């Protein structure tokens, strides 16, 4: 991630990460202060998470994850990471049945708390009405979506790692998705690095199906949006 995220200039505290076993942990301290300080930090963190999902997927490493919020303790040199948000994120992540990520209730509650604070702001800044201006809900990197779990789909909030993340973070080192065959595109990533998917492996095939369905919907909608903004429609 280092050297790619220009949005880090907007955040007072950088996003950190460490890896243990097959787990990647992204974490970021929330700065104390008003929503005008906290909202950019959240946007940068979500950008980092979405970029990690996309970068790993492009390299044939489909990830799944969850974003939580709360008090935690971390000691990287000992691989120690504890706290309620760790448990919540692990529980939600482990039950998902796709390559993707969702926002946990604790994080969503925090977003809405900052949204309410943002709507109470008064005044103007360079002609912009400050009421709602710093709302963290004004972010293209999440979408309401039926999250696929092992038992069923549950309405929730998904992180967007389709081509919107490339434009959001001004990235040009990763090519946009150029195919409309999302099923084949996703399957190729799941089969990267010599992996094979057995015909009887219904569990993995369902993950591919769920991932392709999400990616297809998001990518198609985003392509139409870009065309409409450019006047091509």
Language model features: what each stretch is:
Residues 81, 85-94, 113, 120, ...:
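Conserved binding-pocket/active-site segment within a compact domain
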Residues 98-99, 103-233:
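Intrinsically disordered, glycine/charged-rich C-terminal tails and inter-domain linkers
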């Amino acid at each position: 991630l280092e050297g790619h995220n220009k949005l880090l200039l907007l955040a007072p505290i950088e996003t950190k990460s460490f890896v243990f076993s097959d787990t990647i942990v992204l974490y970021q301290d929330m700065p104390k202060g008003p929503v005008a300080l906290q909202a950019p930090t959240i946007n940068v963190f979500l950008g980092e998470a979405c970029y990690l999902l996309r970068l790993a997927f492009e390299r044939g490493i489909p990830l799944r994850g969850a974003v939580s919020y709360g008090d935690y303790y971390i000691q990287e040199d000992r691989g120690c990471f504890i706290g309620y948000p760790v448990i919540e994120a692990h529980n939600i992540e482990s039950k998902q049945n796709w390559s993707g990520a969702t926002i946990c209730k604790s994080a969503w509650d925090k977003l809405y708390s900052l949204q309410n604070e943002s709507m109470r702001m008064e005044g103007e800044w360079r002609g912009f009405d400050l009421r709602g201006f710093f709302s963290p809900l004004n972010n293209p990197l999440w979408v309401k979506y039926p999250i696929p779990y092992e038992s069923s789909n549950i309405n929730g909030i998904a992180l967007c790692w389709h081509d919107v993340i490339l434009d959001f973070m001004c990235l040009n080192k990763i090519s946009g998705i150029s195919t409309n065959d999302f099923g084949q595109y996703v399957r190729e990533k799941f089969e990267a690095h010599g992996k094979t998917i057995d015909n009887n492996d219904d569990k993995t095939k369902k993950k591919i199906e769920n991932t392709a369905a999400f990616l297809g919907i998001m990518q198609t909608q985003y392509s139409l949006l870009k065309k409409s903004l450019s006047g091509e429609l």
